[in-house]
Design a protein with these regions (language model features):
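Conserved short histidine dyad/triad with adjacent acidic residue
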Residues: 35-67, 87, 97-101, 135
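A short secondary-structure junction signal
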Residues: 53, 126-128
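Glycine- and acidic-residue-biased ligand/ion/polar-headgroup-sensing regions
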Residues: 59, 68-83
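Ligand-binding loop in jelly-roll beta-barrel domains
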Residues: 87, 98-125
Length: 137
C-alpha cells in the first residue's frame, strides 16, 4: 500500500503515559485488606478482534475459573500465580485454546505480572463450557 493507506508498525512502551493502568477487579480479603487486578491495554482492536495487555495481580488476588471466546496466551513475567493446582513461576507460558477454561487463579505472595494476548473476542464466559457452545450455535 502507498501513501496514507500504508500499514505501519505500532510501538508502545510499558511506561507510555497514553496507556493508563486500569483496575479491572478488586476483592476484600479475610484480613480486611484489598487486592486488585490492574491491566494496561496495549492493543484492543475490533477487526480482526484481539487484545494484548500487561496484567498485574496483587498478592493473594483470586480470579475465578473462566475461559474466553478466543484463543488466549499468557506469559508470566514476574512473580508467580497458581492456575488451579499448578504453580506458574516467572517464565511460564500458558496457552488456552478457544472454548477451554483455566483457573482459578491465585497470585503468589509477591503478586504477579503477566503479558496476555487474546486472539479474537476477549470476553470471558465463566467455567461453564455449555455457555461457549451456545455462543457458537
Amino acid at each position: 500500500m502507498e501513501g496514507d493507506d500504508a500499514l505501519e508498525a505500532i510501538f508502545r512502551h510499558v511506561d507510555d503515559d497514553d496507556q493508563p493502568w486500569q483496575e479491572v477487579k478488586r476483592q476484600r480479603n479475610a484480613d480486611g485488606t484489598t487486592s486488585s487486578v490492574r491491566e494496561k491495554w496495549f492493543a484492543f482492536r475490533g477487526d480482526p478482534p484481539y487484545l494484548s495487555l500487561l496484567g498485574r495481580y496483587d498478592p493473594g488476588m483470586i480470579v475465578r475459573r473462566h475461559g474466553h471466546r478466543s484463543p488466549h496466551v499468557v506469559f508470566v513475567i514476574e512473580g508467580s500465580i497458581w492456575c488451579g493446582e499448578r504453580v506458574c513461576p516467572a517464565g511460564t507460558h500458558i496457552e488456552l485454546p478457544e472454548g477451554a477454561a483455566f483457573g482459578p487463579f491465585r497470585a503468589g505472595p509477591e503478586g504477579v505480572t503477566m503479558f496476555e494476548v487474546m486472539m479474537g473476542d476477549p470476553r470471558s464466559w465463566g467455567d461453564r463450557p455449555e455457555l461457549v457452545d451456545a455462543l457458537r450455535a
